[in-house]
Amino acid sequence: MARDYPLERYRNFGIMAHIDAGKTTCSERILYYTGKSHNIGEVHDGAATMDWMEQEQERGITITSAATTTFWERTENGTEPDSEKHRLNIIDTPGHVDFTIEVERSLAVLDGAVCVLDANAGVEPQTETVWRQADRYKVPRMVFVNKMDKIGADFFNCVRMIEDRTGARAVPVGIPIGAETELEGLIDLVTMEEWLWQGEDLGASWIKAPIRDSLNDMALEWRAKMIEAAVEMDDDAMENYLMDGAEPDVPTLRALLRKGTLAMAFVPVLGGSAFKNKGVQPLLNAVIDYLPSPLDVVDYMGFKPGDETETRNIPRRADDDMAFSGLAFKIMNDPFVGSLTFVRIYSGQLRKGDNMINSTKQNNERVGRMMMMHSNNREEIDEAFAGDIIALGGLKNTTTGDTLCDKSDPVVLETMTFPEPVIEIAVEPKTKADQEKMAMALQRLSAEDPSFRVETDIESGQTIMRGMGELHLDILVDRMKREFKVEANIGAPQVAYRETIGHEVEHTYTHKKQSGGSGQYAEVKLLITPTEPGEGYSFESKIVGGAVPKEYIPGVEKGIKSVMDSGPLAGFPVIDFKVQLLDGKFHDVDSSVLAFEIAGRMGMREGMRKAGAKLLEPIMKVEVITPEDYTGGIIGDLTSRRGQVQGQDTRGNAIAIDAFVPLANMFGYINTLRSMSSGRAQFTMQFDHYEPVPQNISDEIQAKYA
């Protein structure tokens, strides 16, 4: 069977934004207008289709990126289509900082993105974070300025903010007519017409009209800016425009705007209000006009499984005749089907019952059930093609970031990097019956979410959950209760401290043990040096002339590494140092790998104490947005939390305060902030770097953990 839709009519795109900009509402409207969803789900009623976990519906935020497939016929007048049906695969990504990892995963498999802004707040901190992530994955994007019906909505201020904050060139292609309660429609700068929404049929019908006189000058001014950006994409068009003042016709103009968007030379901007159902159809048209199809994307370069240099020299592209390859970018537990693995197919075809290999883990997998997802409704399918985003049921060993491919032509597409967790809590099952359920729940949740780690504390035997923030762990604990029916006691959140060394030191350690028969003997001379923050650990042997035989050197490193998990001050992991093995002595009979391992371990422990071991704490980048009246109090409070205020600037009618604050002092901050600002201020924070802990606090922590 052949594919139903040619690749040029595919659009794989994500919807990304700051929390509360209206991302999920936009996705809902898209599903409504494209006929996938028969009633419109409202986030504030807890009924949005894309937010399908109970907690998402209760908290009104999106946690997991739901992938959904829908179809759109481009239309200018709302009644007859002017293009054939396009297939849209949409991924709704979370906007809360604790879930940046979800965004990271979905960006890896998208071709394009729509960035949704709040017309009042503009480019917010999380928008910048996501924008930078999208830059890293080279994802072409366009902007939809949402909530134009809100008080204080300002489209042109948003356009300025895009340029100031992200450095991208913003090119409006559609300008809202009116704002706040006066929002009537939008000016299409490409065709120079007004779109005016009619009546109360949820924005499904509109009329096109010539631009009214009062708006004509403004429209011409912005159209000229748009054309200038567009003609830069083609020498002939530019020459005609500059020499003869000849403007490109509508199809040429769209083609040039598309070329510039794909080259990331600029970002098309439109405005509207998803909640009021105004501006969603022009947005869908723009997705088709300007965002890439899988054919517009450069070849995805992978590397050969087992290649340690990871030389990316194996191309994969959207071609059905190539060998099959796909990337598993998300795992979800579906209450009815069990574990579902979301896969983006980069090349080739996949059929039900096919055998394939997981080249990341070198395991075989078999395709059991194959589904096309619509939020959380599923449609069983028998085959899928390059460019599709599908869900597979029944995969045994595949986790997020793994490559699935044809056995005869294996490739590894991606090695996703996931941030280290900065906050941890201890969990204990309430009853014996809960214990087994909890182990299964934690295993499933950590398979779904690589930024969540589960460890057992060696000394206390407690189970430790580690994550990216309070909200992240809150929701995971909540899911354990709901989805897996586990009752557990939760400890207070703890900070993930680290240890490092203050200065370089040379240390010799001799391990001698005589107890009748053959004894143990090993001597090592170590040079322990601090490295730059974030550089991590390295080991190097400088042994010449066999002072320590080759076969014993791995023992020394093993001993050194065993100290890294539990530093000398308070038992926290040790980071950012390097060790050189300078010299040593051995005994023909009494030396062994074990003896050198013990010497390495003890030498490292003593050496670290001599090297001025220091305790490090995670420092968070905090941004508080507050009405001006509360600024003084909030800055005072941040300073009292050992925060360093970096500056403040005006954001609309509010003030944004930037600061670095130790995580240890940020627990429960949301409650303090709410009471200080009568609930009007909000904040976001994300991990930035590690810094040494002041001595008096370090002493307290050491006493507590000793």
Swiss-Prot record:
One GO MF term attached to the UniProt entry: translation elongation factor activity
Entry binding sites for GTP: 17-24, 92-96, 146-149
Keyword Cytoplasm part of the UniProt annotation: yes
Domain of life from the UniProt record: Bacteria
Principal place of residence: cytoplasm
Gene3D superfamilies: 3.30.230.10, 3.30.70.240, Elongation Factor G (Translational Gtpase), domain 3, P-loop containing nucleotide triphosphate hydrolases, Translation factors
Keyword annotations from UniProtKB, A to Z: Cytoplasm, Elongation factor, GTP-binding, Nucleotide-binding, Protein biosynthesis
One Pfam assignment: EFG_C
A GO biological-process term: ribosome disassembly
GO CC terms of this entry: cytoplasm
Domain tr-type G: 8-295
Compartmental location: Cytoplasm
HAMAP family, A to Z: EF_G_EF_2_B (MF_00054_B)
Family: Belongs to the TRAFAC class translation factor GTPase superfamily. Classic translation factor GTPase family. EF-G/EF-2 subfamily.
PANTHER family referenced in this protein's UniProt entry, alphabetically: RIBOSOME-RELEASING FACTOR 2, MITOCHONDRIAL, TRANSLATION ELONGATION FACTOR G-RELATED
UniProt function note: Catalyzes the GTP-dependent ribosomal translocation step during translation elongation. During this step, the ribosome changes from the pre-translocational (PRE) to the post-translocational (POST) state as the newly formed A-site-bound peptidyl-tRNA and P-site-bound deacylated tRNA move to the P and E sites, respectively. Catalyzes the coordinated movement of the two tRNA molecules, the mRNA and conformational changes in the ribosome.
NCBIfam families for the chain: EF-G, PRK12740.1-5, small_GTP
Name assigned to this protein: Elongation factor G
